[in-house]
Amino acid sequence: MRGSCERSGEDEEQKEEAMVACGRLSGVPEAEQGPEANWDSDLETEGTDGLGELVRDTLYLRSCRAHSVVPISCFLRQGSAQELNLRHRGLGPQGARALASSLSSNPYVKRLDLRDNGLCGAGAEALAGALSKSSSIHDVDLSENQLGVAGAQALCAALTVNQAMRKMQLSGNGLEEQAAQHLAELLLAHTDLKSLDLSYNQLNDQAGETLGPALAENTGLTELNVSWNHLRGPGAVAFARGLEANIFLKVLDISYNGFGDPGASAVGEALKANNVLEELNMSNNRISAMGALSLGLGLRVNQTLRILVVSRNPMRSEGCFGLLKSVQDNPASALELLDFSDIQVNAEFDGLASSVRGILPELCIKTGACRVEYKKELLPVFRSALPASVPK
């Protein structure tokens, strides 16, 4: 045993019976268990409720046998932990089915990390059944699992039933416009979901037209990441209009899409009306100087935005100047970080930056290859925009 503990004779006898049952289910004959199996086994758990954990382990092993999969020893060790990390374990759909039967009755796990397990739609459907019944799990990472539209549909339906979920990560799952309809339904129905990560998918302009109205009506989400998708054209504009009407979202990452000048103009209009958003990342969105000027119209009046990242956009020094001039013209601006990384600026911009710092001494302006420090803590989605030396 990994740690010493004292139990009554009755508890020890019950534990021994449970251990033998586990051995049978895992294919190990009782005769081969040996007395030491009770003391040094991968199935053993620690704590005063060890017997209950063994019962749950037995259920998991029975399910593994039924689905012809090898049990995951780290799950048996972490079964009573609040955070269950099973990323990169190669579970597949069958492994997900075996796991789901145990999770549905597990009262301990609050955060579940199943990133990169090849779950596919079938595995997501199995887990959705467990999530619809769990009252304890509120944070799930299912990124990089090839979930597709079938997986998205199952998960969104499950979360609509169970309002316990607070954070869901679905990055890198090949989600396209068909999945956007189910995601939109989730945004409309789930009022307690606070954080949603849809980055690195294939959400296109049609998806933007679907998600935009849902974002406008959503009444709970505070952090949304849709970076590295294909939002452009009318879809980007529709999405931005959803932001304009939303009154809950505080953090939005739309970097590495194709908003372009029309999308930037729509975001500018949104910033005129939105008095809640605090952090916005629009890096690499094909925004020219003209789009930057349109975006700046929102900065002239907005009083809540603290962080704006527009790095790697072809807006040149003229666009950067226009944005900064808009900030200068807004004495009520709350901006603390304005990031123009990888955009070269001229002396005229530098002069304006000096003047703005006199008005807003707390404002950090980042340009070109210049290394500056922004000392206040950022949410994880924005930390990549800062130099490695900046405290996280």
Swiss-Prot record:
InterPro entries the record matches: Leu-rich_rpt, LRR-containing, LRR_dom_sf
Q: Where is this region: Disordered?
A: 24-46
Signal peptide location: none
Q: Does the keyword Aminoacyl-tRNA synthetase apply?
A: no
Q: Where are the LRR repeats?
A: 106-129, 134-157, 162-185, 192-213, 220-241, 248-269, 276-297, 304-325, 334-356
Pfam families reported in the protein's UniProt record: LRR_6
Listed A to Z, the keywords are: Leucine-rich repeat, Repeat
Name under which the protein is recorded: Leucine-rich repeat-containing protein 74B
Its lineage reads: Eukaryota, Metazoa, Chordata, Craniata, Vertebrata
